[in-house]
Amino acid sequence: MTSLPLGVKVEDSAFGKPAGGGSGQAPSAAAATAAAMGADEEGAKPKVSPSLLPFSVEALMADHRKPGAKESSLAASESAQAAGGLAQPLGVPPGSLGVPDAPSSPRPLGHFSVGGLLKLPEDALVKAESPEKPERTPWMQSPRFSPPPARRLSPPACTLRKHKTNRKPRTPFTTAQLLALERKFRQKQYLSIAERAEFSSSLSLTETQVKIWFQNRRAKAKRLQEAELEKLKMAAKPMLPPAAFGLSFPLGGPAAVAAAAGASLYGASGPFQRAALPVAPVGLYTAHVGYSMYHLT
């Protein structure tokens, strides 16, 4: 309570009195006291270090690192790997830290990894060491992602025509027998029962063999005859060129009828005048060019 009035009095005494004469020491003492109080306040405030901020432009451009930062990061990584291998510095390969990798121990599955999303066991993500085992995971072998294997069906058994058990083997004809049969066929295509029996005995053949040979030979002759007739028809057909115009009439059509009517009316006017022959004018509507040129040549 007593300090505040004293301070006011000091200020009144310091600024109320005019400077000069014997009272000049009072203002200097007050200034010294104020400077001492300001120095104590500055010492009590925390000093701001002039070092650069870590994310400022100057810090990024300078890229100064403390000498103990690398050692601390190495120690932290070693301790993390010794604890369980969960933590690893970002951007640093695992072999560069001097710690050998453990290939046999699989890494635990994370929440956002492939195995974690698909809920697969850890053994499914480990690569097969032996080359004989196919590198296919269970989700690839499921029918949802891969088609089912094709069933190998056994080939159907080839069913052959069953012959009769009492069927006689086919006896090939000799050259002499074939010549005799061909000569007899040219003479007569149909044999009677007596002629067939006599002819078969002369060739040392059965009547059935001679009968079947004549039947086959008649069928062959019929096929050859039909082929020859087809060739003759193709040769006799005239090779006409396609029509030059769409509209055409036969030669001497409506024009010939009109000419004949005019000749009957005006042709025989005199006793010594010849009868006029109907001449069809050559034009667009008489006949197509190909047909007329073919018959003119």
UniProtKB/Swiss-Prot annotation:
<dbReference type="GO" id="GO:0045787">
    <property type="term" value="P:positive regulation of cell cycle"/>
</dbReference>
<feature type="compositionally biased region" description="Basic and acidic residues">
    <location>
        <begin position="127"/>
        <end position="136"/>
    </location>
</feature>
<dbReference type="GO" id="GO:1901330">
    <property type="term" value="P:negative regulation of odontoblast differentiation"/>
</dbReference>
<dbReference type="GO" id="GO:0010629">
    <property type="term" value="P:negative regulation of gene expression"/>
</dbReference>
<keyword id="KW-0371">Homeobox</keyword>
<feature type="cross-link" description="Glycyl lysine isopeptide (Lys-Gly) (interchain with G-Cter in SUMO)">
    <location>
        <position position="9"/>
    </location>
</feature>
<dbReference type="GO" id="GO:0060021">
    <property type="term" value="P:roof of mouth development"/>
</dbReference>
<keyword id="KW-0678">Repressor</keyword>
<keyword id="KW-0539">Nucleus</keyword>
<protein>
    <recommendedName>
        <fullName>Homeobox protein MSX-1</fullName>
    </recommendedName>
</protein>
<keyword id="KW-0217">Developmental protein</keyword>
<feature type="compositionally biased region" description="Low complexity">
    <location>
        <begin position="25"/>
        <end position="38"/>
    </location>
</feature>
<dbReference type="InterPro" id="IPR001356">
    <property type="entry name" value="HD"/>
</dbReference>
<feature type="region of interest" description="Disordered">
    <location>
        <begin position="63"/>
        <end position="109"/>
    </location>
</feature>
<dbReference type="GO" id="GO:0000981">
    <property type="term" value="F:DNA-binding transcription factor activity, RNA polymerase II-specific"/>
</dbReference>
<dbReference type="GO" id="GO:0000977">
    <property type="term" value="F:RNA polymerase II transcription regulatory region sequence-specific DNA binding"/>
</dbReference>
<dbReference type="GO" id="GO:0048598">
    <property type="term" value="P:embryonic morphogenesis"/>
</dbReference>
<feature type="compositionally biased region" description="Low complexity">
    <location>
        <begin position="71"/>
        <end position="100"/>
    </location>
</feature>
<keyword id="KW-1017">Isopeptide bond</keyword>
<feature type="cross-link" description="Glycyl lysine isopeptide (Lys-Gly) (interchain with G-Cter in SUMO)">
    <location>
        <position position="127"/>
    </location>
</feature>
<dbReference type="GO" id="GO:0042482">
    <property type="term" value="P:positive regulation of odontogenesis"/>
</dbReference>
<dbReference type="GO" id="GO:0000976">
    <property type="term" value="F:transcription cis-regulatory region binding"/>
</dbReference>
<dbReference type="InterPro" id="IPR009057">
    <property type="entry name" value="Homeodomain-like_sf"/>
</dbReference>
<keyword id="KW-0238">DNA-binding</keyword>
<dbReference type="Pfam" id="PF00046">
    <property type="entry name" value="Homeodomain"/>
</dbReference>
<dbReference type="GO" id="GO:0042481">
    <property type="term" value="P:regulation of odontogenesis"/>
</dbReference>
<dbReference type="InterPro" id="IPR020479">
    <property type="entry name" value="HD_metazoa"/>
</dbReference>
<comment type="subunit">
    <text>Interacts with CREBBP/CBP, TBP and SP1; interaction with these transcription activators may inhibit autoinactivation. Interacts (via C-terminus) with PIAS1 (via N-terminus); the interaction is required for the localization of both proteins to the nuclear periphery and specific binding of MSX1 to the core enhancer region in target gene promoters. Interacts with H1-5.</text>
</comment>
<dbReference type="GO" id="GO:0034399">
    <property type="term" value="C:nuclear periphery"/>
</dbReference>
<dbReference type="InterPro" id="IPR017970">
    <property type="entry name" value="Homeobox_CS"/>
</dbReference>
<feature type="region of interest" description="Disordered">
    <location>
        <begin position="127"/>
        <end position="157"/>
    </location>
</feature>
<feature type="region of interest" description="Disordered">
    <location>
        <begin position="1"/>
        <end position="50"/>
    </location>
</feature>
<dbReference type="GO" id="GO:0048839">
    <property type="term" value="P:inner ear development"/>
</dbReference>
<keyword id="KW-0832">Ubl conjugation</keyword>
<dbReference type="GO" id="GO:0043584">
    <property type="term" value="P:nose development"/>
</dbReference>
<comment type="function">
    <text>Acts as a transcriptional repressor. Capable of transcription autoinactivation. Binds to the consensus sequence 5'-C/GTAAT-3' in downstream activin regulatory elements (DARE) in the gene promoter, thereby repressing the transcription of CGA/alpha-GSU and GNRHR. Represses transcription of myoblast differentiation factors. Binds to core enhancer regions in target gene promoters of myoblast differentiation factors with binding specificity facilitated by interaction with PIAS1.</text>
</comment>
<comment type="similarity">
    <text>Belongs to the Msh homeobox family.</text>
</comment>
<keyword id="KW-0805">Transcription regulation</keyword>
<keyword id="KW-0804">Transcription</keyword>
<feature type="DNA-binding region" description="Homeobox">
    <location>
        <begin position="166"/>
        <end position="225"/>
    </location>
</feature>
<dbReference type="InterPro" id="IPR050674">
    <property type="entry name" value="Msh_Homeobox_Regulators"/>
</dbReference>
